Amino acid sequence: FVNLSERVIAVKEIGESVAYREYELLRNLVRLGAPCVTPTAVITERADLSGNALNSVLVTEHLSYSLPYRALFSQYMRPETATRLIDALAVLLVRLHLLGFYWGDVSLSNTLFRRDAGAFAAYLVDAETGELHTEGLTQGKRLYDIDIARTNIIGELMDLQAGALLEPSVDTVEVGDRIVTRYTDLWEVLTGAETFDMGERWRVRQRIERLNK
């Protein structure tokens, strides 16, 4: 992170073609209203003081009041922190998939979190492996993203336990499985088809209540 004229920016060093690709992906996601960081620039033809070539960098705006998951666990070392982060990540993943975005590397590490009325809101911060499909995602791509998320989350939680940031009693596999169930439930509520008779308005109210939850 770099302080620049009362602004904070994030600088990510990557190859030139990858930097331009991620920049365009993030721009398109911002245009679509996705919860993600805002790209600012790609800087190329960099060199150190000795004249040696350096990789290009992608510059993004720092997301105010956001924290990476490790910082949150260092502040709130409670088992429920893990489940709340998973719930936030599930909401983010559903929103991205509805926009036709395949992430390709879903993880807590590639996400920033903000506190939101006792819960957390999640934001995509790394789109390097992503793909935007204007025609929508296939079920195969959605399920693969979920499987990647589960695997990565379990590994990240185990790493937190090894670093004494998460209680040993927490079942990391069970928490990792939660991303699958939460995503599946939310996706079904948002996209599932239901048929109502004229006299079953209570089912409409019930559907709205599920959406609000």
What are the language-model segments listed below?
Residues 206-213:
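Long, charge-rich C-terminal accessory regions
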Residues 113-119:
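Activation-loop N-terminal segment of eukaryotic-like protein kinases
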Residues 14, 116, 136:
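Surface loops and adjacent helix of pleckstrin homology
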Residues 64, 108, 129:
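Short, glycine/acidic-enriched loop or turn micro-motifs at the edges of active sites
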Residues 10, 112, 123-124:
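Structured core elements
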Residues 120-196, 200-203:
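C-lobe/activation-segment region of protein kinase-like
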Residues 106-113:
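Hydrophobic residue at the +6 position relative to the catalytic HRD Asp in the kinase catalytic loop
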Residues 1-83, 87-104, 120, 152-154, ...:
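Conserved ATP-binding subdomain of kinase catalytic cores across diverse folds
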